[in-house]
C-alpha cells in the first residue's frame, strides 16, 4: 500500500531535521493518511479510500465525493478514483 493520497496525490516528502547547532539529518515527512468510507450520491454506493486529512476536508467543503471528483484534475487522482470519476460522469450524463 503506497503512502499517497488517492484523491490529491499528496505523498511522502523528504527533508532535514535541523538541530540548534545547525546539524542536518535526513528525514521523511509522511502525509496524514486516513482510511475512510465515502458515499457517492450519484452511484448510491460506498467506497473505501485512503485519503489525507486535507483531502477529506476538501471533499466536505466541496459538498461530497461526487462534487470533489467532478472538479478534480484527473492527473492527480489514483486509478481507482479515475474509474470512479468516469462512472459518476456517465451516470450524471444519463440522468441529465
UniProtKB/Swiss-Prot annotation:
Gene Ontology terms: biological process: translation
GO CC annotations, alphabetized: cytosolic large ribosomal subunit
GO molecular function: structural constituent of ribosome
UniProt key word Ribosomal protein: yes
SUPFAM superfamilies named among the record's database cross-references: L28p-like (SSF143800)
Pfam families named in the record: Ribosomal_L28
InterPro entries in alphabetical order: Ribosomal_bL28, Ribosomal_bL28/bL31-like_sf, Ribosomal_bL28_bact-type, Ribosomal_bL28_sf
Disordered, as annotated region: 1-24
Ranges of compositional bias, category Polar residues: 1-22
Top-level taxon of the source organism: Bacteria
Ribonucleoprotein keyword on record: yes
Keywords of this entry: Ribonucleoprotein, Ribosomal protein
Family: Belongs to the bacterial ribosomal protein bL28 family.
NCBIfam families: L28
Record protein name field: Large ribosomal subunit protein bL28
Amino acid at each position: 500500500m503506497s503512502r499517497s493520497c488517492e484523491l490529491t496525490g499528496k505523498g511522502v516528502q523528504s527533508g532535514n531535521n535541523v538541530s540548534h547547532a545547525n546539524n542536518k539529518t535526513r528525514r521523511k515527512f509522511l502525509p496524514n493518511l486516513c482510511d475512510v468510507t465515502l458515499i457517492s450520491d450519484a452511484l448510491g454506493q460506498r467506497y473505501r479510500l485512503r485519503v489525507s486529512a486535507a483531502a477529506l476536508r476538501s471533499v466536505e467543503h466541496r459538498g461530497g465525493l461526487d462534487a470533489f471528483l467532478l472538479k478534480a484534475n484527473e492527473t492527480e487522482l489514483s486509478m481507482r478514483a479515475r474509474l470512479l470519476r468516469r462512472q459518476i460522469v456517465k451516470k450524471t450524463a444519463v440522468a441529465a
